[in-house]
Regions:
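A conserved FAD-binding loop/helix module that cradles the flavin
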Residues: 25-29, 142-171
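A Rossmann-like FAD-binding core segment of flavoenzymes
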Residues: 32-129, 170-171
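Glycine-rich dinucleotide-binding loop and its adjacent helix/turn
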Residues: 1-22, 26-34, 125-129
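Phosphate-coordination loops involved in phosphoryl transfer and adenosine-cofactor binding
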Residues: 11-13, 68, 136
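Cofactor-binding loop segments of dinucleotide-utilizing enzymes, especially the Rossmann-like FAD-
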Residues: 20, 43, 144
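FAD-site-proximal beta/loop scaffold in flavoenzymes
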Residues: 1-9, 103-151, 161
Length: 171
């Protein structure tokens, strides 16, 4: 689930955030204002995030964390009911109604790199944001590979814009 898109659906419910970096820290802080309980489940041995996030998390009263966890399964019939994981080989179960995965991601830009398209310093495809065109005339890009919000809704809009631009390019 998307924290900002779906977080409000979990008002006064227990949720889990699976992750380890700034994204997980921001998700915990955001959800702590909505959910009854926020449990961070991390494969790392500690939360590695900006100090300002770590300080704010320390003051939360509805937060708990489990580190060094290996996620085994998310269970539920029609809705999420629990997260199953292992810590040091010991199986554990946590009852939650929502799960937000914040493990970080890196879009696959291999084809763009192979084509020789210009890339940003962050490793994304460099585009003209007005028409989604890349550094190669007639080649357009959209979605996570171009950076930005990393949201499905914005990717759909950018994809539509890229499609229209491609049609205009083709005449």
């Amino acid at each position: 689930y998307c924290v900002h898109c779906d977080g409000a659906l979990y008002r006064n419910k227990a949720v889990a955030v699976i992750g380890y970096g700034n994204g997980a820290a921001r998700a915990v802080l955001y959800l702590a204002n909505i959910a009854s309980r926020v449990h961070l489940i991390s494969p790392k041995e500690k939360l590695v995030a900006e100090p300002v996030y770590l300080e704010r998390i320390k003051s939360l009263t509805n937060y708990a964390a489990t580190f060094g966890a290996q996620i085994a399964e998310i269970r539920g019939e029609e809705f999420v009911e629990s997260v199953e994981f292992n810590v040091g080989g010991t199986p554990r179960s946590l009852k939650v109604e929502g799960v937000f995965v914040e493990m970080g991601m890196k879009p696959n830009v291999e084809l763009a790199e192979n084509l020789g398209l210009d890339m940003t310093s962050g490793g994304f495809v460099k585009i003209n944001r007005l028409n989604q065109e890349t550094s190669m005339p007639g080649v357009f890009a959209a979605g996570d590979m171009t950076g930005g919000r990393m949201q499905a809704a914005t990717a759909v809009g950018a994809g539509a814009s890229a499609g229209i631009s491609a049609l205009q390019y083709l005449g």
